[in-house]
A protein has these predicted regions:
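Alpha-helical scaffold segments
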Residues: 1-165
Length: 165
């Protein structure tokens, strides 16, 4: 994916951000948010999918349980970059109050990340506001894509998992 994404369309970045297995793809997610070429919409989606609403309950790093501090740090850095204009503006949008990705429930697209967590309202307005642009949910992914990856890339990943076992 690191070879694929730099030349991929902007919506591919967002599809991966919204459909990826964050437990298994943490290194790639981290790589994505370190790239100034990452579309704003993908960065904002990663912010919310990474638990920004949950971590909003903590005012300082010291309040965060030890085992979660690294994730808190990642979210703080991502928030600072996003609000500072680090990411690339594109025609792809993302609305954290109306995410067209159904979060595993095809019958309920339109998830509200801000209302979904009681502490999310305390986050800065800039990360709660919709980014203008086409709202590409996972339902718009090309047929055959798995976890936000083209079939041929997913096949390589699956083979690597099998080889490790």
């Amino acid at each position: 994916m690191i070879e694929f994404l730099p030349n991929a369309p902007d919506d591919a970045w967002l599809w991966f951000a919204c459909d990826s297995n964050y437990d298994g793809n943490g290194q790639l997610i981290k790589w994505m948010i370190e790239q100034p070429t990452c579309p704003e919409a993908a960065a904002l989606a990663i912010y919310w999918y990474s638990g920004a609403g949950f971590y909003a309950q903590y005012q300082t790093r010291e309040q965060v349980p030890d085992h979660s501090r690294d994730q808190f740090d990642v979210l703080q850095s991502l928030q600072q970059r996003f609000l500072g204009g680090f990411y690339r503006k594109t025609a792809v949008g993302f609305d954290p109050r109306n995410d067209p990705t159904p979060i595993g429930i095809l019958e309920r697209p339109g998830y509200d990340w801000v209302a979904g967590e009681p502490h999310a309202e305390s986050l800065p307005a800039g990360v709660k506001n919709a980014l203008a642009g086409t709202q590409f949910g996972v339902m718009n992914m090309p047929e055959g894509w798995v976890e936000g990856m083209p079939l041929e890339i997913n096949a390589v990943v699956e083979q690597e998992y099998e080889d490790e076992e």
